[in-house]
Each structure stands twice: as structure tokens, then as C-alpha cells.
Amino acid sequence: MVKKQHVAGQLARQFHKVSMAHLQADDARDEYAMAAYQGRMDAIREEVSWHQASCGAGALMQLGAAATIVDQAVDRLKPCELMALKRLIVSLAGFVEANSNDRRSDFDRGYLGI
């Protein structure tokens, strides 16, 4: 049985697999597969926000979800607020990396958002 506190880490691993499959579909120019994988990545980003991070990968995934939300709210934020939020997210990601074995480079940074 899956413990609730480990869900964010499992979602991070799923996200990594799906993002790698998305890149392969992109290389193969398979638009249908790319759209399907993009939908799955968006769903995982939404799902991860409901769970507590219990590992570095889960925390990075949650920071990636936060970065995506910030990017979607860019037209509602002052430029100084936008830059401050981005700096905070990157700073927290650096803290997670310094205190865990997980790295942003373990993910496709274009999809993680940080």
C-alpha cells in the first residue's frame, strides 16, 4: 500500500517518465502522442499540489508546479512580483538539491519549469 506522504515522490517519477516519452514523441514528430503526454504532464502537475513532499524529487516537482502557475499568472503580477516569485522558487529548488540526492537536471527542465 502506498503511504500518503510518498505520493509526491511517486508523481515526480511518473512525471519524469512521461516527459521523457514526450521528448521521444517530439523527436518522432508524433503530434497525437505529444498531445497525450502533455495532457498527462499537466494532470500530474495538478495532482502533485495535493500531496506533501517527502523527498527531494517530490519537492522539486511541487516547485515545478508552482513555477508553472506563476508563468500562467504573469499578466496578473507586477514585474517585481514575478521576478521575486521566480527567485524564491529557484532558491528553494537549490535548497532541496543541497539537502537531498535529487537534482533539477534529473528532470527535463523545460517541463519542470525551474
Task: State the predicted function of each range.
Residues M1-I114:
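Sequence/structural signature of long amphipathic alpha-helices
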